[in-house]
UniProtKB/Swiss-Prot annotation:
Record-listed 3-methyl-2-oxobutanoate binding positions: 44-45, 83, 113
Pfam families: Pantoate_transf
Cofactor entry: Mg(2+)
Phylogenetic classification of the source organism: Bacteria, Pseudomonadati, Thermodesulfobacteriota, Desulfobulbia, Desulfobulbales
Compartmental location: Cytoplasm
Gene Ontology molecular function, alphabetical: 3-methyl-2-oxobutanoate hydroxymethyltransferase activity; magnesium ion binding
Subunit comment: Homodecamer; pentamer of dimers.
Active site (UniProt): 182
Cofactor note: Binds 1 Mg(2+) ion per subunit.
Protein's UniProt name: 3-methyl-2-oxobutanoate hydroxymethyltransferase
Amino-acid positions noted as binding Mg(2+) in the UniProt annotation, renumbered to this chain: 44, 83, 115
Family assignment from sequence similarity: Belongs to the PanB family.
CDD domains: KPHMT-like
Length: 279
């Protein structure tokens, strides 16, 4: 049975930690769902992990709908959160509501997620008032990383911490059903988590959050350019993928693949086709 927003909020109340991972396609979403993941996040991180961009900014609504729909087809009963891409909610409440509706109707997600604090509260309220659950995102917000001075830890000084704390409270008042806290000191995340009734899901925010999220490509060791401090590799798949492909190339070039067990046969003598004597 598919989880609901009520179920996820109840996990916080019961002290049950929430597990969330990104997924971008049907095959991976099926595997993660089979493993028992609580939440699948179709993140705009797909811009870097799947589409080859150097940030999340170029990701479009069409990109998000395409990948969300694939994830939903792979895991029809999973609880799916979908990112609203940059530009889909910054132009006003009406645009935000229409785009959020599209993600639910065409993408099939259960909740939309957007970045920002007090400034996005009117948009959050408008989307929630339209009957669409919203998850917030504070701390390091990748869509506006350039304004923050790059991909850096946020909330280290008291002024920034006070603002983030206040933003979390305002987002809760605006109606969010959960909050991602990214790259902030563990102590700050713990205080924010204790101050709001909705679940917090951390990424680089310590153990004090109600749950944790990682990018699947990072967690499985598929991305080798760099490893953020907050990432733990639960597998190292990149070397295995390379080795498997190298083995395949070697066998193809040597004529060792395909073998008899991989080949279809027939009792027909097809060589007569070459002589034209098959009439």
């Amino acid at each position: 049975m598919r989880k609901t927003v009520v179920d996820i909020i109840a996990m916080k109340a019961a002290g049950q930690k929430i597990s969330m991972l990104t997924a971008y396609d049907a095959s991976m979403s099926a595997l993660l769902d089979q493993a028992g993941i609580d939440i699948l996040l179709v993140g705009d991180s797909l811009g870097m992990t799947v589409l080859g961009y150097d940030s999340t900014v170029p990701v479009t609504m069409a990109d998000m709908v395409h990948h969300m729909a694939a994830v939903r087809r792979g895991a029809p009963d999973a609880f799916v959160v979908g990112d609203m891409p940059f530009g889909s909610y910054q132009t006003g409440a009406r645009d935000a509501v229409l785009n959020a509706m599209r993600l639910l109707k065409e993408g099939g997600c259960d909740v939309v997620k957007l970045e920002g604090g007090e400034v996005v509260c009117p948009v959050v309220k408008a989307i929630v008032d339209a009957g669409i659950p919203v998850m917030g995102h504070l701390g390091l917000t990748p869509q506006t990383a350039a304004v923050l001075g790059g991909y850096k830890v946020q909330g280290r000084d008291m002024e920034a911490a006070r603002k983030l704390f206040a933003d979390a409270k305002r987002l809760e008042e605006a109606g969010v059903c959960g909050l991602v806290l990214e790259c902030i000191p563990a102590g700050l995340a713990e205080v924010v988590t204790a101050s709001i009734a909705v679940p917090t899901v951390g990424i680089g925010a310590g153990k004090g959050c109600d749950g944790q999220v990682l990018v699947i490509n990072d967690m499985l060791g598929l991305f080798e350019k760099f490893t953020p401090k907050f990432v733990k590799h639960y597998a190292q798949l990149a070397p295995l993928v390379r080795q498997g492909v190298e083995n395949y190339i070697g066998e193809v070039r040597a004529g060792a693949f395909p073998e008899a067990e991989h080949t279809f046969t027939s009792s027909c003598d097809y060589k007569v086709l070459l002589s034209g004597d098959d009439q």
